[in-house]
Amino acid sequence: MTVKVVEGDFLQGASAKYAIVVGRFNSFVVESLLEGALDALRRHGVAESQITVYRAPGAFEIPLLAQQVAVRTKPDAVIALGAVIRGGTPHFEYVAGECAKGLGQVSLQSGIPVAFGVLTVDSIEQAIERSGTKAGNKGAEAALSALEMVGLLQQVGE
């Protein structure tokens, strides 16, 4: 007897429709995340006509916009991008926690994969490193996660 293993790949998601929800706050970092995500999708055969970018004011607003996009436009996946940088107040914990929790709820309630590309970092330097320099581009990684999940969900139940 052989165990069946189901895994996603990056090819099955090429014909899918993607929504990218981007927080504008900390735009100097977020724009690099967006470019990374768009580049990753294009490199894997996703046409620009299959991608729509929605801009939220900041990370706290991303979950609601992602939820409405999921419900109203029914993309195959949502890619959430933003940057929350720790400061001297508890604001970071509130925004980062609610954003992560909200996006998880959107995914579970809608049945649409939501890839988490929202940086939650301690410093501007860490944000820059994770948006295309030393630590790669987390926007590109989120796009690859979305591609893989689309392919994986297509196989569930086959």
Swiss-Prot record:
(2S)-2-hydroxy-3-oxobutyl phosphate binds at residues 88-89, 130. The active site is at residue 91. It is an enzyme of class 2 (transferase). 5-amino-6-(D-ribitylamino)uracil binds at residues 25, 59-61, 83-85, 116. It catalyses: (2S)-2-hydroxy-3-oxobutyl phosphate + 5-amino-6-(D-ribitylamino)uracil = 6,7-dimethyl-8-(1-D-ribityl)lumazine + phosphate + 2 H2O + H(+). Forms an icosahedral capsid composed of 60 subunits, arranged as a dodecamer of pentamers. Belongs to the DMRL synthase family. This is 6,7-dimethyl-8-ribityllumazine synthase.
